[in-house]
Amino acid sequence: MRSSVLSLHPDRLLPADPGTRAIARRLYAQVATLPIISPHGHTDPAWFATNAPFANATELLLVPDHYVFRMLYSQGIDLDALGIPRADGTRAAVDPRAAWRVFAEHYTLLRGTPSALWLNHVFHDVFDLRIRLDAGTADHYYDHITAALQTPAFLPRALFERFNIEVIATTESPLDRLQHHAAIAASGWQGRVVTAYRPDPVVDPEHEQFAGALQQFGALTGEDVLSWDGYLRAHRQRRAFFAAHGATSTDHGHPSAATADLSPVQAQRLFDTVVRGEATPEQAELFRAQVLTEMAAMSLDDGLVMQLHPGCFRNHNRQLFEQYGRDKGADIPMRTDYVHALKPLLDRHGNDPRLRLIVFTLDETSYSRELAPLAGHYPSLLLGPAWWFHDAPEGMWRFREQTLASAGFYNTVGFNDDTRAFLSIPARHDVARRVDSAFLAKLVAEHRLEEDEATEVAIDLAYRLPKQAYNL
């Protein structure tokens, strides 16, 4: 069967109604080429430090992208057949071309998903491909992309510049020595790559690496991390180290949004239980909750913006986790409480405008009921954009619809791409800019906004708000 033409319609994601679409076109034209602010994500800083060529199409576009391979896994495709690394660092002996062929044969599984939007954008605009990916074009795609990746124009730094990225934030453990960020800073290259402090391995007693990570934390900082005061000093030390390497934010991926405000005596007693490895699930939750409030206090001192990404049941598939480890597409959204969960932290610090806490959710039912009213009241609280399972066009639209009334636009922070898939970053930002243009065009068409106001909001959402929210 002959492969079909790959094209990107200039009006994709814009309204079907001709009048509203015309407004959206004008709004989108004002934001389409703005620089990209990428304030939160998971790209590898080694890419930009070494500027080495990406290996091949499979290693770049398939292996790191759990959005993609989770869909294939759901249809019975073994992750070994895709070359996904196992938990012990080994891989099945699968040829990258063969893995790509499997992906191409099943590319139809992504129809209508945001992954298809992003990948088609990458294929069309980054690699200049004009036929669709399928079983018949798999080798053509693999050869074309892999050959391009060996050329100077496709080195990581060249792509960073081509994508018009003004700044990108990576996310590192407190145990990371940040040697790649140091190398970038020393290289003379003008691309701005900053880090973010993600202390989960030394904050979550239920993390499989917690005991060993805590030991390393102490060795790295020289602090007595088996005492509560020493543990907090170690965090302050590492936060300062991260800030010296460009960090403007911290990130916390907790099962819930729980916070606590224990006395020092209560905190020490709880910490003693944790370090002995005797914490119950309830005590582990209380410990994470207390550390969040401590992190907020530290942010008042050092100015780092807090991000909270709660409400995900991590590694739901035990067998897959044991075989392949974390971040393999088996994380599932959960119902999440914010009103009660955040109250201890907000009682302590919520009225201080020096604190900036950006809250995300995978529970869309909380948008209008809890999060928008909270952000529309507390000067310390901002709403992160539609996240992960909800960064599809439909999810972005629902986010705007359900938060606008109580939080407005200016208690939100623009867009985060939050991705490991480097080449998809322009596509993800383009989708967000198109959806916001469409949403704003509807408000203009309904005479709720003047077009000049909508234009200013569109620019703010695409560029100014993320810079402002993250101190970039």
From Swiss-Prot:
The EC number(s) this enzyme carries: 5.3.1.12
Task: Show the taxonomic lineage.
Answer: Bacteria, Pseudomonadati, Pseudomonadota, Gammaproteobacteria, Lysobacterales
Family, as annotated: Belongs to the metallo-dependent hydrolases superfamily. Uronate isomerase family.
Named in its record, the pathway it takes part in is:
Carbohydrate metabolism; pentose and glucuronate interconversion
Q: Which reaction does it catalyse?
A: D-glucuronate = D-fructuronate; aldehydo-D-galacturonate = keto-D-tagaturonate
Alphabetically ordered keywords of this record:
Isomerase
Tell me the GO molecular function terms.
glucuronate isomerase activity
Superkingdom of the source species: Bacteria
Annotated GO biological processes are: D-galacturonate catabolic process; D-glucuronate catabolic process
Which gene produces this protein?
uxaC
Look at the named UniProt entry and state the broad enzyme category this protein falls under: isomerase
Name used for this protein in its record: Uronate isomerase
